[in-house]
Amino acid sequence: MNILVTFDNNYLEHALNMLLSLKRYNDNLTIHIIYDDLSIESINKLKEFFEKNNIGNLKLYYQQSDKDVSVIETDYITKSCYLRLYAPYIIEGVDRILYLDPDIICQGTLEGLYNMDLDSKPIAACENMLREEVKYLRELMLEHILMPKDAIYVNSGVLLIDIDKYKESLTIDQLNNFLRDKSQFLDYHDQDALNFLFYKKIKFIDNTYNYQINAVDSGKEDLNKIIIHYSESTKPWKKDYPWPNKAIPYYEFLKYKREN
């Protein structure tokens, strides 16, 4: 399987944790990492981690962010998040690739997801999940990027991408121009861009492969999902995380921290 990950120095340890969980259930991995802000120290640590844990093949791509694209950054959204949108123009010799956010945990094989029929669509993704008390935001999320109220807004944390179909649907010039002209209106950053640019071109998949646990009301979480995604700004490695670590599937993070 060809897996795509993008992150910066701040998310290195969390990405390594995700890869540990991925490797536990999946073999024959080639991990493609596109970056614009990884130090030499981080890259060396990454290479040592791959060798020590026998993760798979590692391919690194340095891609400098477009200086003309002024994106809004937060403590968990940086320019590196936008690199996933450029992956099909950077990675060669691959027909499809599975993008995974570094803030997820894998709890099973991803073969079924990776090999699914995309029905001639360039992307497969899961609907963005919202807690009951904030579901009114759904229409606002669609409205601010000029999408119909009945459209399905997807989460960009797990994306199965057909490389050729993606490039047929969107040229790199179109992507550059869109981000250059519209980035200030993208409240949800690269996720907004993906939804707007690929409207009606996305195959929708079950949230088994992208269970956004922070969007579930407390006490109603279903932890028997293949991918648990700690989306939004609340993360289990932060001190203010509302649930005890032992009660959630994030033990690999603690294991990695203890052993390294």
Task: Annotate each PLM feature.
Residues 1, 5-7, 156, 161-260:
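A glycosyltransferase accessory/donor-loop signature
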Residues 30, 34-62:
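Acidic donor-binding segment of Leloir-type glycosyltransferases
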Residues 49-90:
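Active-site-proximal specificity loops/subdomain of glycosyltransferases
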Residues 21-29:
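Short, acidic, metal-binding catalytic loop of nucleotide-sugar glycosyltransferases
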Residues 2-4, 30-32, 59, 98, ...:
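A structural signal for isolated positions on well-ordered beta-strands in alpha/beta enzyme cores
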Residues 124-145, 234, 238-245, 249:
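A short, conserved beta-to-alpha structural element at the edge of catalytic cores
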Residues 64-66, 80-134, 153, 160-161, ...:
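GT-A fold catalytic core of metal-dependent nucleotide-sugar glycosyltransferases
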Residues 146-158:
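A recurrent flexible, glycine/aromatic-enriched loop bordering the glycosyltransferase active site
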